[in-house]
Each structure stands twice: as C-alpha cells, then as structure tokens.
C-alpha cells in the first residue's frame, strides 16, 4: 500500500493554492471555498483560517488544507490491497491494519489486542466497571456512548429512517443500510475458508468460528458453549432466575428481551417498539 501524492506536500499542489491570501482592512481571516481559494475568497485574521464552504475555523493552514479535501473530494491515499482511497493519511493507515492483521493496542488487564486505540479504551470499561453515560429519563447507566444513544430512542419511540422498498422503519440509519442488503441481495462478507458469502458481518463472524476453535464461552453450571459472551450472559439467567425486563402494564418480569418485546407489542396494538 502506498499513498498517491497528487502534489500534496509540495509548493505546486493544493497546499500552495490555499496559501494565497488577501489582506483586508478589517479583521483578517482566511476563507476558502470548495473550488479552491482565490484572491476574492481568502481573507486573513492573524493565525485563524476559515473555510468559506462550511464555516469551520482552524489555527493552521495545514489543517485548512486537509479539511478542504472533504469539499473537493480529493483522496490522495489509496490502498493497493482493496483500492479504497482516503483523504487523510491517518485514515489511510487505520484500514491497512485490516489487511495486515496488525493489532498494536493491547489491554494490560487481559492481554486482548485491538487495531485501534479507541476500541481498546472502550473495551477497558469492562474491567473498570465505569458507566459514564446516564439516561436522564430512567437513570440507567451505560459504558458505551453508542449503546446509550440507542437506549434513549426507546423513550421517544421515534423511527426516522424508512425503507423505500417495503416501508419498514428504523431508529438508526445504520440499521436501514443493513436492512437494504435484503433487497439488493448484496453479500459482501466472504469466508476465505469455504467461499460462502454472507449479507451481515455478524453472521459471517459466527460462521468463521465453525472453522476455528468453536465456542469460546462456556457455562460453568452446565458446560454449554456459546459463540458470544452476551449469549452466555442470557443463558446464565436460566440458572439464576434473573428477569431484568419488566412489563409495566402487568408488572410481569422477563428473562429475555425478545419475550419482553413481544409482550410490549401486544400492549401497543401490534406496533413495534
């Protein structure tokens, strides 16, 4: 893998264009539109640089240059493995680890490794027990911001993203994108062992385990094995009797979210919650 240069980093490319300036009699401020800067679009204000296209402000020319690629569509860093291009070097380096298998970020508690530091920081909350995100509606706390956001939507019941093919609605755009693969027939995940293809990454990973060591999560009570930790957690409730989901209509408790959702659907007149 190697980056395409396209004049970046030299005095002849996009960088030199953005450095064009005009000094005004008022406050000095660099402004740049997506078509590239000109004497009519660049104004200086000390060490502050502003993008005329979206209003973003930067304290360095280099940051403005890098930001401009969002508007111009310039992606000078191309992966030789998959052909995907990226506007910034940092974005180019991260996907490289997918191809190389490099995972430089290691958890000091258990030794688990990750290809991104952000993934490691999220994972460490499992060991610390930290749950910094609290729902103002019900007081429930969460370790991960993504899970917290997903939970908040359950209070509003709003599903903003609708499928144009079948009309089904979703809380998140990512869920709609995933659903659309059903209509397009897209199966981007291919098993390198047997060649089988899958629509969803989660199903692909589960299939991949059939070629490896099997089910790494084992119940200490009965010895049953599971592919995922959350499956083991759910199974453990059959031994402990824990029922964390409560129906407010009948004050009935459920051990599984699927059973709780089905009961809630009855009360809502058949509408998915």
From Swiss-Prot:
It comes from the Eukaryota. PROSITE patterns: ZINC_FINGER_C2H2_1 (PS00028), ZINC_FINGER_C2H2_2 (PS50157). One of its GO terms (cellular component) is nucleus. Keywords: DNA-binding, Metal-binding, Nucleus, Repeat, Transcription, Transcription regulation, Zinc, Zinc-finger. May be involved in transcriptional regulation. Belongs to the krueppel C2H2-type zinc-finger protein family. This is Zinc finger protein 80. It comes from Homo sapiens (Human). The lineage of its organism: Eukaryota, Metazoa, Chordata, Craniata, Vertebrata. The gene is ZNF80.
